[in-house]
């Protein structure tokens, strides 16, 4: 089902195809200026009135994976976050070691410019959001919550558990976002 978002955008349920393939296909639609992939939905923004029908949406469900290899990022991390010790007690694991052992994929972008929701978090680190969000997290903070990990691209409020910080990388700036949907990310210490 396609939902109008004003006169220049639509939103529809996210098909099972890979996020990279969806973005590539939707960007090829006539008049598309931006595509936002969320966990359950996709929004497409247009220069004028959307010229999309149900056939466009249906075709997304059968997309092959994007053949272009994903970009790989290795982010240097210092695991010294405010919640690290508490999470180690709660989960019973060495949070830094387990977090750094995984390879993550950018599944969606949102919340803030350059905020990448990374999937691939070890299930032992799957914790809910904090009961009380913090008023300010520093740009570069590495955090986990609700089955995701992320690096805060800007100073902002946040309700995720802080486990460390990225050094030598700027997640968002005048040149845009360092990460894009489908990119792969590893953390090293």
Language-model regions, residue ranges each:
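Glycine-rich active-site loops that engage anionic ligands at enzyme catalytic sites
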Residues: 1-189
């Amino acid at each position: 089902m396609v939902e109008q978002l004003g006169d220049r955008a639509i939103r529809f349920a996210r098909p099972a195809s890979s996020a990279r393939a969806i973005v590539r296909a939707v960007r090829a639609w006539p008049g598309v200026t931006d595509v936002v992939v969320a966990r359950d939905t996709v929004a497409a923004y247009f220069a004028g009135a959307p010229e999309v029908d149900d056939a466009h949406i249906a075709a997304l469900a059968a997309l092959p994976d994007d053949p272009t290899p994903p970009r790989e990022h290795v982010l240097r991390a210092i695991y010294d976050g405010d919640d690290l010790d508490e999470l180690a007690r709660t989960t019973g694991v060495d949070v830094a070691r387990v977090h750094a052992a995984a390879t993550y994929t950018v599944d969606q972008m949102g919340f803030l410019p350059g905020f990448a929701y990374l999937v691939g978090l070890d299930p032992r680190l799957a914790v809910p959001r904090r009961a009380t969000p913090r008023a300010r997290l520093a740009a570069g903070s590495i955090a986990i919550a609700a089955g995701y990990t992320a690096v805060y691209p800007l100073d902002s409020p946040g309700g995720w558990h802080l486990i460390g910080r990225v050094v030598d990388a700027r997640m968002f700036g005048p040149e845009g976002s360092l990460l894009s949907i489908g990119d792969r990310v590893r953390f090293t210490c």
